[in-house]
């Protein structure tokens, strides 16, 4: 798995997978995308946009933010999943929140390889 492929697996869900609520969405998606074993990842953000549109941040759709980080000029629909309780041992139970924000990512060779944060 390349760094780009890992970015896609962990952070891109487009179109957004249907779920009755954000809690169910997060519990399903975190498990489905391999972020609940061997330990539960504390927090993770899914971007509901195409890989192509996110990749533009590495070029004309983004501005330098220091090092290999770039800030998107556009806003994206996001779902952020946060682990409930202190234990990182499965079963993992997540709560989720949705927002529309600009994002900061790291690029390598013109491709997104790391999600830094919403800005």
Swiss-Prot record:
Reaction(s) catalysed (UniProt annotation): an [RNA] containing cytidine + H2O = an [RNA]-3'-cytidine-3'-phosphate + a 5'-hydroxy-ribonucleotide-3'-[RNA]; an [RNA] containing uridine + H2O = an [RNA]-3'-uridine-3'-phosphate + a 5'-hydroxy-ribonucleotide-3'-[RNA]
Pfam families: RnaseA
Primary enzyme class: lyase
Entry's EC annotation: 4.6.1.18
Keywords, sorted A to Z: Disulfide bond, Endonuclease, Hydrolase, Lyase, Nuclease, Secreted
One of the protein's GO biological processes: defense response to Gram-positive bacterium
Active site: 11 (proton acceptor), 114 (proton donor)
Keyword Secreted: yes
Superkingdom of the organism of origin: Eukaryota
Residue positions binding substrate: 6, 9, 41-45, 82
Annotated compartments: Secreted
GO molecular function, one term: lyase activity
An annotated GO cellular component: extracellular region
Family statement: Belongs to the pancreatic ribonuclease family.
Function statement: Endonuclease that catalyzes the cleavage of RNA on the 3' side of pyrimidine nucleotides. Acts on single-stranded and double-stranded RNA.
Name listed for the protein in its UniProt record: Ribonuclease
Organism of provenance: Chelonia mydas (Green sea-turtle)
């Amino acid at each position: 798995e390349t760094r780009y492929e890992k970015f896609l697996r962990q952070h891109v869900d487009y179109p957004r997978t249907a779920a009755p609520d954000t809690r169910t969405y997060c519990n399903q998606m975190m498990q489905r995308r391999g972020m609940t074993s061997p330990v539960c990842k504390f927090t993770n953000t899914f971007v509901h946009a195409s890989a192509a549109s996110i990749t533009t941040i590495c070029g004309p759709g983004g501005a330098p933010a220091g090092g290999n980080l770039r800030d998107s000029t556009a806003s994206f629909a996001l779902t952020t999943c946060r682990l409930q309780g202190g234990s990182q041992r499965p079963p993992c139970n997540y709560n989720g929140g949705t927002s529309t924000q600009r994002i900061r990512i790291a690029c390598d060779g013109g491709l997104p390889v790391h999600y830094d944060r919403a800005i």
